[in-house]
């Protein structure tokens, strides 16, 4: 009798353990901690009107932005998953946040659900679609963002209260989003809506973005339309890429402010551990006194390992008019700069 009871109990425990193991295998959960620590020194001429030079350390990172992030994912079965991402930026020099408003997860903060076939829907603070697509066509792949003009010209870098759908249909990457403005009685004010695509076929990439937002300027919300087109082609270790971006801010008291950015360049993988990048970026602003800015950049990155990179960069900026303006804060005719540093991933 006792043997039969113990046999029954043992069978029940084994069945329960098997069920728990099956549930564990069915619902795999992972949380990854990641980040970047980047320290660089930059020498720049004509940093102020009158020709003064300056040596600085951008503690937010040159080659990559300094960040600390948490990436979580739970397997829900049948190709479905729940996921989240929290990411903040920090100042390497003093350990503080890289923003003055004290936002803890200022870089990214979103949660969503995804499927291998049907794509993902994410909600929260996220990169804009223009940011996602432009990074594919930037010759520097969005390295040196404090120096290059693309992130600040990409229809905003991030959206708050954003609902984004993303999927890959074979060779086509497709994204669409709606950032809620949160203004009572007005669905448009403060809102951003955009759509973007990038098509990849062998060595060729072609993509574009269109977006419209109503941004608060002073006490009024102004319409702001944006579009971008990019193309890239790979020839062995060399990738040639470029694009054009245009933004139309509908100012009420004056002609619209139109900002155009054209860019192009190459990325050459000389060896698996050495990468050369070069590019030219031209920005024109219709109502800016400086009118036009041209930026030429070359860089060399040496990978000590998969996680550690030594980098150097030289850039030259010229202005059509040497006057103080938003486009030309120092009011100089040209500037030359050199940057060196180290970038570590974890």
List each language-model region with its residue ranges.
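Sec/Tat signal peptide C-region and signal peptidase I cleavage site
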Residues: 21-27
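Outer membrane beta-barrel
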Residues: 28-43, 55-181, 189, 198-202
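Transmembrane beta-strands of outer-membrane beta-barrel pores
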Residues: 39-45, 88-92, 127-129, 171, ...
């Amino acid at each position: 009798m006792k043997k039969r009871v113990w046999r029954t109990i043992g069978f029940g425990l084994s069945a329960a353990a098997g069920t728990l193991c099956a549930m564990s295998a069915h619902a795999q959960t992972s949380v990854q901690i990641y980040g970047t620590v980047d320290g660089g020194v930059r020498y720049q001429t004509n940093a102020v009107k009158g020709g003064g030079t300056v040596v600085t350390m951008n503690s937010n990172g040159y080659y990559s932005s300094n960040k600390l992030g948490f990436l979580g994912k739970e397997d829900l079965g049948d190709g479905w998953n729940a996921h989240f991402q929290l990411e903040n930026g920090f100042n390497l020099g003093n350990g503080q946040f890289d923003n003055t408003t004290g936002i803890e997860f200022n870089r990214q903060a979103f949660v969503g659900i995804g499927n291998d076939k049907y794509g993902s829907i994410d909600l929260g603070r996220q990169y804009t679609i223009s940011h996602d697509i432009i990074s594919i066509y930037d010759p520097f792949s969005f390295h040196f963002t404090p120096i290059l003009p693309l992130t600040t010209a990409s229809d905003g870098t991030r959206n708050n209260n954003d609902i984004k759908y993303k999927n890959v249909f074979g060779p086509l990457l497709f994204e669409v989003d709606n950032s809620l403005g949160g203004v009572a009685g007005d669905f448009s004010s403060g809102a951003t809506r955009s759509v973007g695509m990038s098509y990849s076929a062998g060595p060729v990439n072609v993509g574009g973005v269109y977006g419209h937002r109503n941004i608060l300027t002073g006490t009024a919300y102004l319409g702001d339309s944006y579009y971008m087109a990019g193309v890239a082609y790979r020839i062995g270790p060399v990738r040639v890429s470029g694009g054009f971006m245009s933004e139309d801010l509908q100012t009420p008291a004056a002609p619209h402010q139109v900002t155009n950015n054209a860019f192009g360049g190459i990325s050459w993988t000389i060896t698996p551990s050495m990468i050369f990048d070069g590019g030219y970026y031209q920005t024109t602003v219709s109502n800016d006194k400086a009118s036009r800015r041209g930026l030429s950049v070359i860089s060399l990155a040496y990978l000590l390992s998969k996680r550690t990179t030594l980098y150097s960069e030289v850039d030259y900026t010229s202005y059509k008019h040497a006057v103080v303006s938003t486009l030309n804060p120092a009011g100089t005719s040209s500037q030359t700069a050199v940057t060196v540093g180290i970038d570590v991933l974890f």
